[in-house]
Amino acid sequence: MRLDRFLVACAVGGRTEVKNLLKAGRVTVNGKKEKSAKLQIDEERDEIRFDGKVLEYEEFVYYMMNKPKGAISATEDPKHRTVLDLLDDIARSKEVFPAGRLDIDTHGLLLLTNDGQLSHALLSPKRHVDKTYMAQVKGIMTQEDVEIFAKGIPLKDFTCQPAKLEIMSVDSEKNQSQIRVTIAEGKFHQVKRMVAYCGKEVVDLQRLTMGTLILDENLQRGEWRRLTKEELEALLASVD
């Protein structure tokens, strides 16, 4: 691996910044100052230090984002802002992608990673990874709707697996409900279509959980952070 790529992967800085740091003599390889960005290094055997601190290479990275409305769950889009546009240069340099998608007008928990194997496992229909959503609904959800969700709703193109619907609150005067929905699938507009099947309309949708991962309530919309060690270990163990 090239030295500059290694330094970017270790979050020392972006590519331009890394080259300047090398020129400044702030990087050593096996105890010797190194200024060549093109130097080929062995990330497992060579000791690379930045300002005296040993750098450890990480192949995969994992970010939790509180996706805002209006951002596309994609790596690029000609018309809309993408979730990658919300990351800084260092995070984008890791070549991460969204593990699954949230609709443009849906907000909440989104996992960004460059670990294709984990992403595939989380999205595999065979694993039935639960995802929980909070929805504001125009209309009054009822116990009958709870039972309809539990049986599995027959939509036009597929029949939903049994899902859990919890009615959190109902406001008869405003004709609205707040519900919590847990599904093991993630089809296009699925929660909205399930609610529409019951004759109501989702007006706001937020994803709260995906498998063991729970949205950090301290993350504002558009903010992101690395997964904690505990979060990552639990997530990896859940698909092992």
Which residues are covered by each model-predicted region?
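Basic, flexible Lys/Arg- and Gly-enriched helix-loop patches that mediate nucleic-acid binding at interfaces
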Residues: 1-240
